[in-house]
A protein has these predicted regions:
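Hydrophobic transmembrane alpha-helices and their membrane-interface caps
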Residues: 296-341, 681-724, 752
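Extracytoplasmic
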Residues: 122-294, 535-670
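Pore- and gate-forming transmembrane helices of large, multi-pass membrane proteins
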Residues: 351-382, 730-758, 775-777
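Signature of alpha-helical transmembrane segments and their immediate interfacial
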Residues: 2-42, 408-468
Length: 790
């Protein structure tokens, strides 16, 4: 008697053993990566490629980004009424505000991730120590003009009056060293553009409804690290909660990339939970309703686990870390993965033998998997790190699911259920006659298909593209509004629009920065720029220092100092003069300022082409890029940079690149289909292409076509490809239709959740897939009959 072909044999057990062994090894690797370090990150900028700009511009942008991204600003004030409040007017307790600021700062500094690099006492002492030798060769533009225009007598009288004026500029150096307080005026001028003043040694912003006290701390590691967010954010949350419990009234404004990163990470985790868990719940319900057994559910679970473990292991091996958006994107592949399971189980039901089913479905499974994997791996040729990561994750997940179905499929013992029989009757009585009747009207059938192609093509032709980088934003409205309020209070320099100045040497660089400062005068007069910050303000050119030293020596120490001594009844003026005036120092250079962390954003960098530095601008909201570019065009070695526009332009180029790769992927799939099925491949290719176009046309109605819409098209193509291949191999029967229906319903539920995402990227992705899969489910059966025809 010959052995029953449906019984398990040694080959089946060996294949299953080796696959489970490989899966165990991959699981151990994933577990090791999870235990040794944090495998996930949420920095959206790491998914973007480097901008195609000059190296020095990229380096300065990175320098600025690092400085601003590691900064954490908090503004706090008490809104408790003061004890001196009258019935008519409320006075706010500023001492209470200062107490809250001290308490919060001390709590935050208990974190090992925060440092107080801008401690006001240390900062002031550093300034005084650095500038002390150069105090007699540094003049602000206003003071220089004053010395040039006023008489020596007037300068002496002004200096004498300020000695006895308690509100005059602080004197960092002794009167014998700096009788005209040149050093004090220089240091005060460097901080004059700031809205922040020192009150009781604390940075304060004066306001009618109570003073704001500033806490400015710096992160010593990336704000995108989850462990840093989990360490710092709870400190602030607990502080606010405790104040509310104590009945304190206060306002706290938070600004810094760490808050936006934490909001993005929280939202991404929420999206992963809603998409992944929603999809899994849909699969469980559908499997139990259709198969009335836990065994198919176990089969689906094993296939999904295999795909997820393979995707995680391969992605962690290739990239070391996985972005949370990649994980959210990958969770949508659950629908594709279970497609293989549904087709295998339902055809096993029909044939009554898993062994025969595997042999029969092997070509279809192989064609579907290889086509989809090839399409995903083609994206590795893009210079888009996010696309590359998603491609590897998706391809590895599909491969893992395919291997699981092939290796473990023979162990599935099919049992028919009443639900499957009812679905079969429903298909034969309603679905099959409906599609047969539609196909019998050949002209109508062809007209509808051609009409859909024409309508979608016209819609897409008239839809504008959307390349705004702000669509990547994951911060909530409240956080954005808080950041805007802080910007209004502090009026900081813009980190998005600035100048890059290049030169052959440091001396030439400072001179060009000074010339640019002069060239910006028309914009200052038009109130388009309120101030700017550059190295030239902190370290003037050597030529300017020499001129200022000569002016100070001649006008102040030769002419005004004797008159000042006379006014103050100082008899030994010559000895005093000798100790006060020093010889011209070698000159203050940017190298002398390297210990001042406050200058990090404008610090110069060196390259093979020379030296480069940024000039930051405090801009009016009405200032246009054309205003700033017109100034740059008149200067040598000056370039204007708009970081947001650069990133948006980057999305333009990569949307175009993804379009090319998408067309190439479709051409590759078409070649595989024609090689495998000849002209019958058109039956698969036409509904697949039409579904992708419909999904893209529907999604483009809301915000134009983005690069993420195009990425979603690949997933629609993958699911439509599976549906078409199985219809072709097995014929349009109740089993193949039910499998396609289950797969589509699972994916639609998952992607329906995704299309309601608050993350613009995921929302755009979900809309395309939702519309595309629905279209594929409706359209694909039109092209196939009950039996394989070619």
């Amino acid at each position: 008697m010959s052995p029953n072909p449906c019984n398990l044999n040694r080959s089946n057990r060996r294949n299953a053993f080796w696959w489970l062994l490989i899966l165990l090894g991959l699981s151990l690797f994933v577990g090791w990566k999870f235990s040794s370090s944090s495998p996930f990150y949420s920095d959206i900028t790491e998914l973007l490629p480097q901008t195609q700009q000059q190296p020095e511009v990229i380096a300065l942008e990175k320098q600025l980004q690092t400085q601003f991204s590691h900064q954490m600003l908090l503004l706090i004030r008490s809104t408790d009424p003061s004890n001196q409040s009258s019935s008519n007017k409320i006075k706010y307790n500023n001492d209470s505000s200062l107490e809250l600021a001290h308490t919060l700062k001390n709590k935050l500094l208990t974190s090992s991730y925060l440092v107080d690099t801008l401690d006001q006492k240390n900062l002031q002492s550093n300034f005084q120590a650095i500038y002390q030798p150069y105090r007699n060769q540094l003049l602000t533009p206003k003071l220089r003009e004053k010395l040039q225009q006023q008489r020596a007598e007037d300068l002496a009288q002004t200096a004498a009056a300020k000695l006895f004026n308690l509100t005059s500029t602080p004197r960092p150096y002794a009167f014998s060293e700096d009788p005209f307080n040149l050093g004090g005026q220089w240091l005060a001028a460097q901080q004059s553009n700031s809205k922040v003043a020192l009150r009781n040694g604390w940075p304060t912003i004066y306001a009618a409804r109570g003073n704001w006290h500033l806490i400015n701390l710096e992160l010593n590691e990336s704000p995108f690290k989850i462990e840093i967010q989990n360490d710092i954010i709870p400190i602030i949350d607990n502080f606010k909660l405790q104040l509310k419990k104590d009945g304190r009234h206060f306002e706290l404004l938070e600004s810094g990339l760490i808050f936006h990163a934490a909001a993005g990470a929280k939202l991404a985790k929420k999206e992963i939970s809603s998409v992944g868990i929603g999809s899994i719940a849909a699969i469980i319900i559908l499997v139990l309703l259709v198969f009335r057994s836990a065994v198919p559910l176990l089969a689906v679970f094993i296939a999904l686990s295999s795909g997820l473990i393979c995707a995680l292991a391969i992605s962690l091996f290739v990239f070391d870390r996985i972005h949370l958006l990649t994980l959210a994107f990958g969770s949508t592949l659950l629908g594709v993965a279970v497609d293989y399971c549904f087709h295998f189980m339902l055809n096993s039901q029909q044939l009554g033998c898993s062994q025969r089913c595997r042999k029969l479905l092997a070509p279809a499974l192989a064609t579907s998997a290889l086509s989809s994997i090839a399409a995903y791996l083609l994206q590795l040729a893009t210079p888009f790190p996010g696309i590359q990561q998603m491609a590897v994750f998706s391809a590895a997940g599909l491969a893992g699911t395919w291997f699981a179905v092939i290796a473990l499929g023979p162990f599935y013992q099919p049992k028919n259920s009443n639900t499957i029989r009812r679905c079969s009757v429903f298909f034969q009585n309603y679905v099959q006659p409906l599609y047969h009747k539609f196909r019998s009207h050949h002209r109508l059938y062809m007209g509808v298909i051609c009409g859909l192609f024409l309508v979608t093509a016209l819609i897409l032709q008239h839809q504008p593209s959307n390349n705004d980088v702000r669509t990547l934003n994951t911060s909530g409205d409240a956080l954005i509004e808080t950041s805007r309020k802080i910007e209004q209070l502090l009026q900081p320099n813009s980190s998005a629009r600035f100048y890059v100045v290049s030169a052959a040497s440091e001396v030439q660089l400072i001179e060009r920065l000074e010339k640019l400062h002069v060239a910006l005068q028309p914009l200052r007069e038009r109130k388009l720029i309120s101030s700017e910050q550059s190295l030239a303000q902190w370290s003037p050119s050597l030529k300017q220092q020499e001129e200022d030293h000569t002016l100070i020596n001649n006008k102040l120490f030769q002419q005004a100092l004797p008159k000042l001594c006379q006014l103050l009844s100082i008899k030994n003026c010559s000895a005093f003069k000798q100790s006060a005036i020093s010889q011209l120092q070698q000159g203050l250079t940017p190298q002398h300022l390297k210990t001042l962390s406050i200058l990090d954003p404008i610090r110069l960098i060196k390259s093979g082409q020379g030296v480069h530095a940024a000039m930051l601008l405090k801009l009016n909201p009405l200032t246009t890029d054309d205003d700033l570019r017109s100034i740059a065009a008149t200067q040598t070695g000056v370039n204007f940079v708009n970081r947001i526009d650069n990133l948006s332009n980057l999305l333009v180029s990569y949307r175009q690149a993804v379009s090319v790769y998408l067309a190439t992927a479709l051409a590759l799939i078409a070649a595989i289909l024609f090689y495998r099925y000849r002209l019958c491949g058109l039956r698969i290719l036409i509904p697949m292409s039409l579904s992708a176009l419909i999904g893209l046309a529907v999604a483009a109605q809301c915000c134009g076509i983005t690069v993420f819409h195009l990425l979603a098209v690949l997933l629609v193509v993958g699911i439509s490809l599976d549906t078409g291949i199985f219809y072709h191999e097995m014929g349009l029967n109740s089993e193949s239709w039910l499998a396609a229906t289950l797969s589509s319903m699972t994916s639609i539920l998952a992607f329906g959740l995704l299309s309601m995402s608050q993350v613009p990227v995921l929302h755009q992705f979900g809309i395309v897939v939702l519309a595309g899969i629905s279209s594929s489910w409706i359209i694909a059966p039109i092209f196939f009959s009950t039996k394989k025809t070619c």
